[in-house]
Amino acid sequence: MLAMAMRKTRPLTIAMLAAMASLTACGGGGASNTISFNSASCGGTWTLAKPGWHTFELYNANDVGGEIDLIDPRTSGVYAEVDQFGPGTTQTMSLDVGSGRYAFRCLFEDTDPMTGPAVTVPGHVKGFTATVPVTNNELVGPAKEYQVYAAAGLKTLVGQTETLASDLQRGNLTAARRDWLPAHLTYETLGAAYDAFGNFDDEIDGRADALGVSNPQWTGFYRLEYGLWHGQSAAELTPYASKLVADVRSLLATWPTMEIPLIDIGLRTHEILENALEFQLTGHDDYGSGTTLASTLANIQGTRELLSLLHPLLVTRYPGLPGVYTWLNRLQTLLEAEHQPGGTWVPVSQLSASARQGIDAACSQALQELAPIASIAEPRNT
């Protein structure tokens, strides 16, 4: 289950094909420009006399918010952006300007996109490379493919939860403990759709945090995990298993009418593992089975699915993409090393200090490599 309200405010974000640069004032004495934006003028008259580090003080003179992009007007590629640009506020943008043409593009609320005058920087000096924007149309295909992927996962999940419920109806707790994990892992591969699932996600995979483990309103996979590994009887758990089956069936039936926001396709490539680091790799989501490392592996599978769908868009826009796979592979190898003979997993609380440090470091580095994708794959009005 992903935490709610996951999208973080990005008051100043840069989407570049080169290394992601800071958008705060940069040291080294770079030239500074103060530029005002309003509904009639997207930057007005401004100059760039030479290549090098430049700092722009951007002032929103409008009474509405919006977004400002620094673009290559020939390709609409984005050098840098100010997102969530509030009225009456000033933001600082710093970047290494190379030779070429530059213009500001304004996307204010309730107005059509507007591009300001272009400025030419002479010479043959290389600076940051502009990222060609991803459009809504380019994300429709990946979104539809993910819809099919999630539907297949939910169909599998129906059968797995039915098996789990049957185990408990027959009073076979050993079989139920065995069959709980593969069912839960299937759900853990569907992380890009959790927000689209809405209340179904709370019913199927909700944590006990707000309710407490004794509250009868707490249901789903974690409720069953708690009972199966805390000595509760099959008779006690059967109603929860039956409800889980009913919820998964209802979700599958409703899924064709649900939509994943296009922005989520790129956003979730980072957020799935971000939540794994916070909840799985800390042991927070371990209600007794000790299998949060397996859940993290399932989260990696879900992340890889998104990357596969986005690959045609990313391969020409993000030169850091090979590093994403390098660190996902490294993290996966470290996790698989904790899979024990007989199918059990080492609980996070029992990891050696070196193993835990290695896993956390690999996950953090993978997240760093994944981070630019949300901005690169964000659909933009051009």
Predicted features by range, described:
Residues 31-50:
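N-terminal edge beta-strand
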Residues 37, 86-128:
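Extracellular/periplasmic metallocenter environments
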Residues 27-29:
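Bacterial signal peptide processing site
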Residues 22-25:
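C-terminal motif of bacterial Sec signal peptides marking the signal peptidase cleavage site
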Residues 46-64, 91-106:
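Beta-strand cores of secreted/periplasmic/IMS beta-sandwich domains, seen most often
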Residues 61, 107-111, 133:
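Beta-strand-rich extracellular modules
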Residues 2-14:
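Bacterial N-terminal signal peptides that target proteins for export
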Residues 128-382:
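Mature extracytoplasmic or organellar-lumen-exposed domains after removal of signal/transit peptides
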